[in-house]
Amino acid sequence: DSLLQGFRCSHWIVGGCMQDYGSFTVAALGDELRLQPGQRATPFSHADEVSHPHYYAVNLKEEHLKAEMTALSHTSILRVTPEKDQLVHLVINPNSDEGQGYIEIDTLNHVVYGYNPVHRIYQGWGESAGFSGHFVLAYDARDLVDYGVFEGDNRISKGLKMQDKPRIGAWLTFRGKAGKAMEWMSGTSFTSREKALANLNAENYNYGGLDFYSMMQFAADLWCERLHTIDVEHRDQAKVNQFYGALYRCSFLPHEVSDVGDEIRYDDFSMWDIYRAELPLYTLITPKRSGEMMQSLVGMYQNRGWLPAFPCWNSYTAAMIGDHASAALADAYVKGIRNFDARKAYEGMRMNAFSTPYIYKEYQEGKGRRAIQSYINNGYIPLEDMVEEAYHTNEQTSRTLEYAYDDFAVAQMAKALMDSCRDASQRQKYQEDYNELIRRSENWRNVINPVSGWADGRYENGKWLNNKDLVHRQSFITEGATCHYTWYVPQNPEGLFDVIRHSKPMDKKEKKAEDKVIY
């Protein structure tokens, strides 16, 4: 990147092929007021940046400004220092792709309010998610010389409100002095304007009226506490830095969506990406936080009727494959995490494993396992079932392998609950579930071709596709090749090796293809 259009104030999801939502952007400009992103884009160099978990700074040479930022969970401070006496403009955009944003300048209380309605992607793409990202930005009016709102290039000086139109925003113009820093505080909420302001007050003023440097130090202390849950020593400092960089990045997802002082709730579980390593890591290093995440999943089941597979922006998505909220819940429970409602969690896990929504609209919206009836009836998902009500269609073999693992995980949950249950009839139900799910956890055998020893597509009549291409993507495999997915039997690697050991030796062509495999 060589051009900077502004600073996005958000809770960026970090990976998972998902877009940000409910955000707003703030741009700091020198001298000339330029409203639209393309107009205000200003050159910058990464050599002029400083970036830490608790602090960011960049020199905007053509604007004759130095911009610095620090942030806590719901609030931030933007600090701008002019190099010379000049006008300093602050441009604020609610980033509504649908042209449904709102912005208001409250000149009495010296606050800019706004919201950006959230819309779904994947299942129900473009539909309202039923909430907005709200923000407040507090400013010091002593050096304010102009303000207004705009739509596109249409400026309304001294205007106070703009809404439900594309490319809207507001600007504040201040008289800047060389070397004198200017600060703006912002607060966010996914609930309301009032909660955004309350979050700002709670995280700033309740800590003694934080200025930029005190907030920065407070944020640094929080990050040090988070990152030092694991202490690493190595003679190569670059490897230590790499480790802590990875730990820092994995700390963003899932993210907390509740307001300060409310019961903690998390959302945006990019589940297919995080159930293997990140969520199990949390059970080890931040067990209390892990339990809060698990209770958030339970809350989604209680409020919406189904345990989600890949919940984002307060919605079901059916993105990617598998039923890995069940795997995450089971993993947490068997590792001793107890600050979530395990029995209620099991209700949702069991429902996903054995049933599908009666109302087709609910299935379309992403509730329930995809193609669960095919999986139950056949012991695998046949190639004839194209799994059309999903963002990823087909991928039948990968789904079968992952459902088999999920069944194993739910079985472990059933066993753990059975062991602690005193009611004889309920113990019997857990035992029956365990027996069936353990049986189903061996369904991986139904998609590993016993002749070739590789994962393969299979028809409803039991015949194999007999795929010979091991290294290129196939429609029955998810984001990989058969040479990758064949090994996805973490619940029974010994059984997999036994099947492979008894398969037909590879011919020269297959061996050559295998030798070329690069993960």
Features from the language model and the residues they span:
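Accessory carbohydrate-recognition regions in carbohydrate-active enzymes
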Residues: 1-327, 333-401, 408-419, 427-446, ...
